[in-house]
Amino acid sequence: MISKIKKIIGLVSEKNIPKREGEFFEMTVDMSETNDVRSMHIGSPTIQSSMRISDPYHLELDYTQIMALAAIFLEKPKDLLFVGLGGAAIQKFFYRWLSKCNIVTIEINPSAISVAKQFFKIPLNSKRFKIIQDDGIDYIKNAKEKYDLILSDAFEEYGLPEVFCEIPYFEDCRERLTEHGIFMINLWGSDPRTSAYIDRIKLIFEDRVLHLKSTSSGNIIVFAFNSLLNENRVDVLKRKILTMEKQIDFELMVYFNKILKNQKNKTNYLFLS
């Protein structure tokens, strides 16, 4: 049950109108606290992000824990790009776990940025943690940099905007990846178009795609690989997970095993080619 609701309403000025809209509109960001958990809601009761107040870097929601699996696939990463801020849960995780990485987040909603900065313990004074107010579609299309990871988590009031699920967007994201870069996207599990979106990603990334549905929220996390992993062996990746689990406070192996179960390939390799 939502308690202690705090509401921040941001009227976007003409200067900051998101390029995908073209007129004035209100973007409402609600914040709730229940026991030791603070959550963000954008335009509806749906939880966009949650933070454990006593442990701000803990990944409270299971779908964000699934996202953390990207760490075992990354090869000497330097630059990570996130489209969609929310409460910055996964950004903060990678900021701490990958202590030499630069974290850049693109967020279109100024109210979401304001709430995240005030209430979700973002490392504001770090040179490695940057938030840019912009349209994620345009930013990725026009960016010159290459990224080791691009995570697309751009939900609006009623779900995932269609423009973030179209082939041109997936093509632009792949173009912005390093040679062994990873594209990750959070999809809405109840959306009947989700399977079509995954098929589009498979088309663009030549079937080098993994996905898993979270048990509590129904979110589907998709991992797409720009090229074949240098370390593609399941047994080696499991050893990486065991090492990682000794340093974090949640289990990863359970998610990895579920991903393997979804794979048609039953060999010791994630991908055969």
Language-model region placement:
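SAM/dcSAM-binding transferase cores
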Residues: 2-39, 47-54, 220-273
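A short, flexible beta-alpha/helix-coil linker loop
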Residues: 45-49, 155-158
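Short glycine-/acidic-enriched loop or helix-start segments at secondary-structure transitions
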Residues: 92, 161, 194-195, 233-234
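A generic structural signal for alpha->beta connector loops
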Residues: 100-102, 126-128, 180, 206-208, ...
